[in-house]
């Protein structure tokens, strides 16, 4: 039901295909990447199958099967999962009303939204918000990543001292990205970084460009095998995309940023503080855009024993 209400059965539908694998012909991945980007930007409104097929430049008759083969989900289940995950983020991090969240996520009424949310997460939107965004159903919890396992035992005062937050304004940037699925298998992400670095080196844009990662998915609610991460490179110098890559445009935006140096546990703790410690006590709310992990030491971006990063959360003033 792409052009209407969310299908609350998305969890079952997600099992109707094998886990997604990169197609041998990269043009298939590029076209489906365009569809995913289009869907993420239009979750607030009905989107017809014909529209998505046109974005992908595939026959409407075959598009549904191609999408399922590449993504591991039906178009319906994928779209409705994105809507529910966006709703979960808004419930956790914004003060919007349930009605406003329902409309922002493509539901025609708060009652319809509440039914779909309960079917997806086994809790009501109100209960989810009151619990601080905790999913209590043990079956669902097994499917998602638990960031708490990675957090360092630091007091609130220690976090404030260790992770000072600054506001920065970044201009529009253009470049390329490689989208990786099932990113909790770290080798997949590292291979994508290696591919990106080798490519931009060959195009002579590596020294002056920016290497970063981002994800529009939420590890608190997205099943691990469906979690997507984009390995990105932007440059003021033009360069063409490699065969596994798609074009990227990051709009100008304000970010709350933390500079972090350390292992993956320190990175996870810094992200947790930025959102749960700083954001909810600030005069800002998150923009509907992914956070960035900018690699300050590009030469060693594939060495994941130690990170030098700017963690950047897109924000705007609370209204």
Short names for language-model regions:
Residues 2-7:
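Amphipathic alpha-helical segments enriched in hydrophobic/aromatic residues interleaved with Lys/Arg
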Residues 8-23, 46-82, 102-124:
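Basic/polar phosphate-binding segments, predominantly the helix-turn-helix DNA-binding elements
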Residues 17-47, 80-96:
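A short, Lys/Arg-enriched amphipathic alpha-helix from helix-turn-helix/homeodomain DNA-binding modules
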Residues 66-69, 77-78, 85, 89-92, ...:
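A solvent-exposed interaction/effector surface
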């Amino acid at each position: 039901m792409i052009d209407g209400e969310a299908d609350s059965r998305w969890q079952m539908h997600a099992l109707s295909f094998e886990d997604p694998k990169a197609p041998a012909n990269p043009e298939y991945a590029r076209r489906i990447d365009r569809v995913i980007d289009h869907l993420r930007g239009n979750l607030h409104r009905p989107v017809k199958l014909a529209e998505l097929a046109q974005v992908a430049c595939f026959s409407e008759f075959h598009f549904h099967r191609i999408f399922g083969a590449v993504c591991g989900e039906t178009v319906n289940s994928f779209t409705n999962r994105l809507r529910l995950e966006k709703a979960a983020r808004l419930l956790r991090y914004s003060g919007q009303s349930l009605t406003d969240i329902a409309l922002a996520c493509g539901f025609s009424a708060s009652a319809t939204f509440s039914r779909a949310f309960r079917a997806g997460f086994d809790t009501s939107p109100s209960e989810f918000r009151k619990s601080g965004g905790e999913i209590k159903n043990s079956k669902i919890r097994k499917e998602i990543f638990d960031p708490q396992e990675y957090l360092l035992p630091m007091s609130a005062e220690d976090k404030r001292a260790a992770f000072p937050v600054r506001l920065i304004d970044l201009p529009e940037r253009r470049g390329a990205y490689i989208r990786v699925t099932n990113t909790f298998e770290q080798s997949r992400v590292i291979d994508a970084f290696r591919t990106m670095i080798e490519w931009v080196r060959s195009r002579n844009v590596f020294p002056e460009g920016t290497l970063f990662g981002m994800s529009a998915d939420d590890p608190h609610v997205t099943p691990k095998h469906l979690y997507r991460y984009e390995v990105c490179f932007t440059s003021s110098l033009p360069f063409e995309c490699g065969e596994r890559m798609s074009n990227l445009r990051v709009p100008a935006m304000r970010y709350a940023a933390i500079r972090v140096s350390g292992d993956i546990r320190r990175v996870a703790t810094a992200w947790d503080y930025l959102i749960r410690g700083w954001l909810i006590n600030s005069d800002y709310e998150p923009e509907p855009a992914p956070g960035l992990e900018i690699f300050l030491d590009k030469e060693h971006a594939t060495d994941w024993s130690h990170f030098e990063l700017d963690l950047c959360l897109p924000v705007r003033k609370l209204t």
